[in-house]
């Protein structure tokens, strides 16, 4: 985080503390989305993924301890309201809020509340986001609390692939490794293999289009220098001669791509370059 990297406490004004309070209150309300939340989103004359069903409230959910999401990082509507990567990130962020509350604001009450909330979300994930009756335990992408699960991953961040990147667990965690194997395979309906590349795409873009951002994240979450280099080379070879990283490209025809300039993907690619170079120096 910025604070961990710089030690700069000046950014933590009273307004930021109020924002922390608003985050906790909002997420707690959305733990009970169906009964307590006033949020809805309705849009007409649009694809189904651009609006929420059930008169704007989304599909029904049961209480789990997780917090509800209407939309994914891709801006597509969730199928089931508990988006697991986002809840994992929320658990991490709540821990960060607790740390700042103690160290900067000297507010032990807020810190304890954030810590307890973080643990509640994590316990719900570890209890209810694991696919039942499988030989190995791995995480679903979305659940609804009624027993419905969605097995997939989306290139947009946060994702299941990126779990170690945002600090929910390390990349040696058994459930993460099991999940990684699933989402980097045909078990993920948005994993595509072609003549030029293979990787994770998104329902937000076309079939058989994969996202360089997911390739970069595959490298960033690997300990293998060989895999990191392979992802760098794959991204560079599929830039359609533009010297830029695109949103997505066709696995058979990389010159067929979306967004000629996608700064999010360019940034994650650059981070992988730095990560790879840094490790090479260490080695």
Model-derived regions: residue spans:
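Structural signature of alpha-solenoid helical repeat junctions
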Residues: 1, 12, 86-89, 110, ...
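Substrate-binding groove/exosite segments of carbohydrate-active enzymes
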Residues: 1-4, 82, 163, 216
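Aromatic-rich carbohydrate-recognition surfaces in CAZymes
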Residues: 1-51, 262-277
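Structural helix-adjacent loops and short alpha-helical linkers that scaffold large soluble proteins
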Residues: 3-21, 101-116, 167-181, 220-233, ...
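Short, structured segments at the rim of ligand-binding sites
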Residues: 21, 120, 255
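Extended ligand-binding clefts on enzyme/binding-domain cores
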Residues: 24-91, 103-104, 112-211
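Membrane-embedded hairpin module used as a gating/binding unit in multi-pass transport
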Residues: 93-99
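C-terminal capping/lid segments that line or modulate ligand- or cofactor-binding pockets
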Residues: 150-170, 207-283
